[in-house]
UniProtKB/Swiss-Prot annotation:
Pathway stated in the Swiss-Prot or TrEMBL entry: Amino-acid biosynthesis; L-proline biosynthesis; L-glutamate 5-semialdehyde from L-ornithine: step 1/1
Membrane-crossing residue ranges in chain numbering: none
Needed cofactors: pyridoxal 5'-phosphate
One GO cellular component term: cytoplasm
Gene3D superfamilies in UniProt: Aspartate Aminotransferase, domain 1, Type I PLP-dependent aspartate aminotransferase-like (Major domain)
EC number: 2.6.1.13
UniProt keyword Transport present: no
Gene coding for it: oatA
Modified residues (N6-(pyridoxal phosphate)lysine): 267
Reactions the enzyme catalyzes: a 2-oxocarboxylate + L-ornithine = L-glutamate 5-semialdehyde + an L-alpha-amino acid
Full protein name: Probable ornithine aminotransferase
Family membership: Belongs to the class-III pyridoxal-phosphate-dependent aminotransferase family.
InterPro entries in the record: Aminotrans_3, Aminotrans_3_PPA_site, Class-III_PLP-dep_AT, Orn_aminotrans, PyrdxlP-dep_Trfase, PyrdxlP-dep_Trfase_major, PyrdxlP-dep_Trfase_small
GO biological process: arginine catabolic process to glutamate; arginine catabolic process to proline via ornithine; L-proline biosynthetic process; ornithine metabolic process
Length: 416
């Protein structure tokens, strides 16, 4: 018997949920659906019920679940050489480094594993650049972040958050952070002008995902870029959720026609098969960190490198940015046509969208998502009254229309 499968017994959803509650730390509040298998835009629970996936593991499976090309790359490389650590060179990483930098038009990549690691790495890079290149006085560097941001769960990252549920009773937090309103270039310039000699970086999500798919004013990111150039500050674009075709462009910052100083990638860079992340930037910034001063055992592994190249191939070869743009416009138009008192607003870009539920409506976003699941569609609330809707980018027009019908049916069931 396969030693792995011998440890995985046939259990009901109820049994598995209870088992997890007993033996795993309570860090999430999941919709009570237990995945057993997944393919493309669909997942199946342990009772074999099929669902449309409209969360995509927070946009980690843009290429669809278990894309055969990415799975094949993983299996082939895993059977050959999965891990070398960066103590030695390996055959695949140098080729991946060349591939991804040329793919996005940057000079260098720093490979990590999780999105939060990429964010932490960018903070270290920005600070180091500030001290070495800009001449900021030692231990005086400032990073600007936005209220409503979500960049991860590590101590450094939650220090940039203004959400008490992220940082409460985890202090002391990291110093050297100034938080400004998202979508306010006026506040950005005020802080930059007041602390011009101390600010090393401004980290921003092109669209705030966890905040509820908050789309800034047109041209916001371009103005931020111009201000950062004016005050000699690094613009760091967290594209971990918004990048890789999700919003209808390869990077969401492409909508503004800019090239951030640092770009952070994660999630869909592996097609959902492995934790892989990357920081892209110019040599002027990247080479401020010397050998032995930063790293990761698994970052840049042969396995991660092969998987990431396959995942990026799929995004481009299957024109997933174009599909996201076209179907996103169609989806928002269809959802906006649903006349229901609970729907306060529909917003988004590409296939990163959200329905804002009127907080005074008698049914919560959670209740609506539970009803979605009962009808074969999986989505998750964020910030109590917002439902994020982000299917794999491989979804078809016919499937989008099927899902719109499910969404309409669920809202209609709450009319009375």
């Amino acid at each position: 018997m396969d030693p792995i499968s011998s440890q995985i017994q046939e259990c009901t959803s109820k049994e598995l949920i209870e088992m997890e509650s007993e033996f795993a730390a309570h860090t999430y509040h999941p919709i009570p659906v237990v995945f057993k298998k997944a393919s493309g835009v669909h997942v199946w629970d342990v009772e074999e019920k099929q669902y449309f996936d409209f969360l995509s593991a927070y946009s980690a499976v843009n290429q669809g679940h278990s894309h055969p090309k990415i799975v094949s790359a993983l299996i082939t490389q895993a059977q050959k050489c999965a891990l070398s650590s960066r103590a030695f060179y390996n055959e695949v990483f140098p080729q991946y480094a060349k591939y991804i930098t040329e793919y996005f038009g940057y000079e260098m990549v720093l490979p990590m594993n999780t999105g939060a690691e990429a964010v932490e790495t960018s903070i270290k890079l920005a600070r180091r650049w500030g001290y070495v290149k800009k001449g900021i006085a030692e231990d005086q560097a400032i990073v600007i972040s936005c209220k409503g941001c979500f960049h991860g769960r590590t101590i450094g990252v939650i220090s940039m958050s203004d959400d008490p549920s992220s940082y409460n009773k985890y202090g002391p937090l990291m110093n050297g952070i100034i938080k400004i309103d998202y979508n306010s270039t006026q506040q950005l310039e005020e802080v930059l002008s007041q602390h011009a000699d101390r600010v090393c970086g401004f980290i921003v999500e092109p669209i705030q995902g966890e905040a509820g798919v908050v789309v800034p004013d047109e041209g916001y990111l371009k103005k931020c870029y111009e201000l950062c150039k004016k005050y000699n500050v690094l613009l760091v674009a967290d594209e971990i959720q918004t990048g890789l075709c999700r919003t209808g462009r390869m990077l969401c910052s492409d909508w503004d026609g800019i090239k951030p100083d640092l770009v952070l990638l994660g999630k869909a860079i592996s097609g959902g098969l492995l934790p892989i992340s990357a920081v892209l930037g110019g040599k002027d910034v990247m080479l401020t960190i010397k050998p032995g001063e930063h790293g990761s055992t698994y970052g840049g592994s042969p396995l991660a490198s092969a998987v990431a190249m396959a995942a990026l191939d799929v995004l481009r070869d299957e024109n997933l940015a174009e599909n996201a743009q076209k179907l996103g416009e169609h989806f928002r138009a269809q959802i906006s046509n649903i006349n229901h008192p609970a729907i306060q607003l529909v917003r988004g870009k590409g296939l990163l969208n959200a329905i804002v539920i009127d907080p005074n409506f008698t049914v919560s976003a959670w209740d609506i998502c539970i009803k979605f699941a009962e009808n074969g569609l999986l989505a998750k609330p964020t910030h109590d009254n917002i439902i994020r809707l982000a299917p794999p980018l491989t979804i078809t027009l016919e499937q989008i229309d099927q899902c719109v019908s499910i969404i309409k049916k669920v809202f209609d069931s709450f009319k009375n």
